[in-house]
């Protein structure tokens, strides 16, 4: 979190120069300074959604952490993918486990998807099970407690909340998807989960355009996709919130309106 400083410090020195190797400051908790192109799509989305929270980007987490404390008044540092960042001492380790593929293929990178062996769960203070679909997870919890019998285990699910127009901010209720012919646009790791969410909400998903995770969309490929959707008489294009921040506003209003699906996390155990 970002606390008010008694004596706010300027980032520049007396000669107006920035400190050397300044971290990327997506937000200082009050003002967003970088767009998604320079900060990255996920940091930008965090900065957009988290008022009062500073968001910094840097390979050197120690350097950016010191900057956050000294210049932004932060008293708590939360690292993304921080469990493997052993240069910085941790007071807590929070591990997320996807219920759909809790241990990936069972193998570590590069053969599989695990960054550490399952036994590393023993270091976790909290283990959050994600995308559980409201179903009991006794079997998975039992498997996890073999590695860590003392960590608090939290069961959660990702749930859609509403649709928001990418360029106008107009919001629609989820029922607006029922019976509509929808085209999906995504550049995420597991697009099928997003597409199935739309189907479960009653949409007829007719077109799915998938790009690699974090893909930076070219305007030409987007326009080609928009034209295809118009030719097929789609009612709407739906993308993810993470992808929405990478969509540049076209010069002309698209024939098919473009929305992102707002997803929020709900803890139920």
Q: What does each model-identified segment do?
A:
Residues 77, 95-97, 153-155, 204-210, ...:
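Short hydrophobic/aromatic-enriched beta-strand-loop microsegments
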Residues 59-61, 189, 242:
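Short beta->alpha linker loops
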Residues 233-252:
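Phosphate-bearing ligand-interacting subdomains
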Residues 193, 217-218, 245-250, 267-269:
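Short active-site-adjacent structural elements
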Residues 4-148, 155, 162:
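Phosphate/Mg2+-binding loops and adjacent switch elements
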Residues 159-161, 212-216, 254-269:
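Short, flexible loop segments at boundaries between secondary-structure elements
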